[in-house]
């Protein structure tokens, strides 16, 4: 069975692992998931990520995301929300980019310049598809 929304699957895996205080999340690899993980690392929501080649007998590479917690196991990710979905795409112009919690969170936007945060897209004056909010 094919996956309808791999981005929502990734965000759900990260959200669930974060709520269960897991140290890492394993998921199927794709380029867009790698770019989302890169943005999450740049913004300080995760410790890091890496891609592993398939084990013998396994199909496809896996993306492993290392989650980040505070000194007393406080979660660095308070919430994640998928905005643009396969059934309802959401786009934003460069003049109308969303702010997540007044700038405390980050919006991940797919632009012609690649995946960018709302701040990066605003500086470059490009709009695009609003994939998700993270706070």
From Swiss-Prot:
GO terms for biological process: translation. It comes from the Bacteria. Coiled coil: none annotated. Keywords: Ribonucleoprotein, Ribosomal protein, RNA-binding, rRNA-binding. Transmembrane segments: none annotated. InterPro entries: Ribosomal_uS8, Ribosomal_uS8_sf. GO terms for cellular component: ribonucleoprotein complex; ribosome. One of its GO terms (molecular function) is rRNA binding. SUPFAM superfamilies: Ribosomal protein S8 (SSF56047). One of the primary rRNA binding proteins, it binds directly to 16S rRNA central domain where it helps coordinate assembly of the platform of the 30S subunit. Part of the 30S ribosomal subunit. Contacts proteins S5 and S12. Belongs to the universal ribosomal protein uS8 family. This is Small ribosomal subunit protein uS8. It comes from Parafrankia sp. (strain EAN1pec).
